[in-house]
Structures are given as structure tokens and as C-alpha cells.
Amino acid sequence: MIGLVGKKLGMTRIFTEDGVSIPVTVIEIEANRVTQVKDLANDGYRAVQVTTGSKKANRVTKPEAGHFAKAGVEAGRGLWEFRTAEGEEFTAGQNISVEIFAEVKKVDVTGTSKGKGFAGTVKRWNFRTQDATHGNSLSHRVPGSIGQNQTPGKVFKGKKMAGHLGDERVTVQSLDVVRVDAERNLLLVKGAVPGATGGNLIVKPAVKA
């Protein structure tokens, strides 16, 4: 089963009949319009390409305009692709709604995390701080040693150091689907998802469900 592209609207909470409060993220999933269907013969793999939302006409490039026109769909805010299994049939111009999640219990949500700029090792990697006193005057939040000696004579790749934090692709797995509101194109999932309000999200059935 493919996933869908939505937009993060924010968080709220809903109550069960027992009065238990459930924190939920509200994801708006407008109809995903199929722009291209890929197959083994022409592309070497099976996939469906979709778009959603809208884009100002003066922001659409000529190649994009031709691509959307060929599929007979309105220009969207981006293009996304989902692999399809043998037997799953889609056609260009088809609309796929949030209702496909009606029977799904858990989903994986992918988004771009909030960028937090340049951060030190304590904030970025949860390094412990060094002594506040006991003779330590200047090295409270420094990372400490970053290597060994003449052997190996280099800093290993992947060493955790200060740098840019956030603004990267993150996936949160196995979030419970709390409600599917097909009338308002909303999907409510339990817990938090990556990214800022208004950010694009990719929602797929959970791989570990």
C-alpha cells in the first residue's frame, strides 16, 4: 500500500469515552493527484508519482507545467513518489484521498525537523558537561578529546562534534491512527511528528505494524 503527502497543522488533544486525554497531531491530507505511473518496462521499477496542494501559475516552470498538463492535473506544491507492489493499479489524473487510511492502525510519518542552527555538543549530542568548579575555569561545555595520538593521526569520520542541528529528514515510526476525517481531509495521529506547522509530511502504513 502506498502512502500520502500531507501538511502538519499542529497539535491538540482529544478525549476518549473514559475521559482519557490523547495528544494528537493533526495532518491535513488533501487529495493526492497522480501525475505519473512508473512500470518495469519503461522505468525498471513500479511506482506512482503524486502531487498535492496548489502552486501559483507564475511559480510553475515550463517543464513542470508540461508534466502536470500531460497528466491532466492542477500544478501542486511538489512531487513525491511511492513504490507500488505488483497488482496495485493507478492511472494518471487519479485522486487518492485520506480514506485509504480508514483501516490502518499505525503509520510512519516522515518530515523535515526544525532547524536549530549551530549547536554545541551538549545540545546536539547530549554530551555531559565537565565540572563547574574544582579548578575548571574555561572547559565547562567543551567536547574534550577528539582523537588519539600519532596513530591513527586523524579524527575519525562520524566523530560527534559541534555543528548544524536539525533541518534534516526524520521518520517517526508506528504512530497510532486516532481518527480519519475524510470529510475535512484530516488524519489525527497520536503523539508528535517532525517539523514545523505547515511543513510537508509523508504518511505511510507502518512497516513494523
Curated annotation (Swiss-Prot):
Q: Return the GO cellular component terms, semicolon-separated.
A: cytosolic large ribosomal subunit
GO molecular function list: rRNA binding; structural constituent of ribosome
User: Looking at the record's lineage, which domain of life comes first?
Assistant: Bacteria
UniProt entry tagged with the keyword Ribonucleoprotein: yes
A biological process from GO? translation
Xref: Pfam families: Ribosomal_L3
Record's keyword terms, sorted: Methylation, Ribonucleoprotein, Ribosomal protein, RNA-binding, rRNA-binding
Q: Which SUPFAM superfamilies match?
A: Translation proteins (SSF50447)
Q: Specify where the region named Disordered lies, as residue ranges.
A: 133-153
Q: Which InterPro entries match?
A: Ribosomal_uL3, Ribosomal_uL3_bac/org-type, Ribosomal_uL3_CS, Transl_B-barrel_sf
- Keyword rRNA-binding assigned to the entry: answer is yes
Cross-referenced PROSITE patterns, in alphabetical order? RIBOSOMAL_L3
After translation, the protein is modified as follows:
Methylated by PrmB.
According to the UniProt record, list the residues that bear N5-methylglutamine. 150
Family stated for the protein in its record: Belongs to the universal ribosomal protein uL3 family.
Subunit structure and binding partners: Part of the 50S ribosomal subunit. Forms a cluster with proteins L14 and L19.
What job does this protein perform? One of the primary rRNA binding proteins, it binds directly near the 3'-end of the 23S rRNA, where it nucleates assembly of the 50S subunit.
Q: What is this protein called?
A: Large ribosomal subunit protein uL3
| Record organism | Serratia proteamaculans (strain 568)
